[in-house]
Amino acid sequence: MSSGHKTQPQPSAGPGDRVFTKAEPLRPPAATYTISARSKHPDAPVFGYLRNQYGNVRLAEIDSLFGFVERSELYGGRAFRQRELSDRDVEQLNNAGIGVRLPLSNHFVERSEYEKNLPFLQKYHRPGNSVIVTNDDLARWVRQDFPFYRIDASVIKNIKTHKKIDEALELYDSVVMPMHINEDLDFLEKIEAKDKITLFANAGCALTCPSKLCYISFSRFNKVGQGEIQCSRSMKDRYVMGMVDFPLQVFIDLGFHRFK
């Protein structure tokens, strides 16, 4: 601006002249997901892992990650080989409002084992984190001593009747349904507590497995870190479908919003 000229003050813009609008709260997502940290190396940054493996899922849609932290004989569902989520991962996830789900789905839990794992459970005991449980005694002990954990009934419990769902929800906060239930829309529609149900977004070999021997063998393996891992594939014929992605909008329209 050159010298010698006086400028007149401009009237301030009124609300109607502004190009921005008042910020509104973000709408909650139509669906949220609990995501597997399987095969994640503990040294890999967790948000880099999410970007590379689940880049199509917005962070606002991620409820939690489930995976191994330090070793525990309470683990089940698959064999513990090494840690997947580091302490830094857990801290960063929790700071971002994303929970950590500990897969404590071992079939066999003694009281002495539970007491041995009290420091482990205390370490991750904070609102937003959860435990995945198969053994009802373990669920009761955790409920009594660690009220901040959400307790999820594992898919391994194979809860597949409306009566069993209602009974499970007397102890558990939510129930993970077997994969094949996704194909029975009439059954799903009749579930009353849909907000406490987790359905599978995709499915692998367990969808058509006739016996699921592996889960018991994983429970035994994780007690000592060794042993035979069994699979029924060589014992019983099955139709192998590979990885199956379910059409989630069908389930959302029925009133389900939590997916794994």
Predicted regions and their residues:
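Intrinsically disordered, low-complexity segments enriched in serine/proline and basic residues
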Residues: 2, 9-12, 18
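Selective for proline/serine-rich intrinsically disordered segments
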Residues: 7-9, 13, 23-26
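Active-site pocket-lining/capping segments in soluble small-molecule metabolic enzymes
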Residues: 17-164, 171-260
